[in-house]
């Protein structure tokens, strides 16, 4: 399954590089007030992030997890951008 009707685009960007760019079904991120999940069709959102784990559900049904050092998360249309100082 290369892409699905549930998928949307996510970019994870650091000052050094584009760390990830791809189609995902969902993302769970560490907001300042707790974890939040974003799916395709989410309302526009701008959220501050604290350090923690980001979990992606990829469009091929696999999962990936990254550790971030805080940052910001934006959703607009069917595209999301996660900006962070550091990711591993």
From Swiss-Prot:
It comes from the Bacteria. It is a peripheral membrane protein. One of its GO terms (molecular function) is proton-transporting ATP synthase activity, rotational mechanism. GO terms for cellular component: plasma membrane; proton-transporting ATP synthase complex. The keyword Nucleus does not apply. Keywords: ATP synthesis, Cell inner membrane, Cell membrane, CF(1), Hydrogen ion transport, Ion transport, Membrane, Transport. It is found in: Cell inner membrane. Its main location: membrane. Produces ATP from ADP in the presence of a proton gradient across the membrane. Belongs to the ATPase epsilon chain family. F-type ATPases have 2 components, CF(1) - the catalytic core - and CF(0) - the membrane proton channel. CF(1) has five subunits: alpha(3), beta(3), gamma(1), delta(1), epsilon(1). CF(0) has three main subunits: a, b and c. This is ATP synthase epsilon chain. It comes from Chlorobaculum tepidum (strain ATCC 49652 / DSM 12025 / NBRC 103806 / TLS) (Chlorobium tepidum). The gene is atpC.
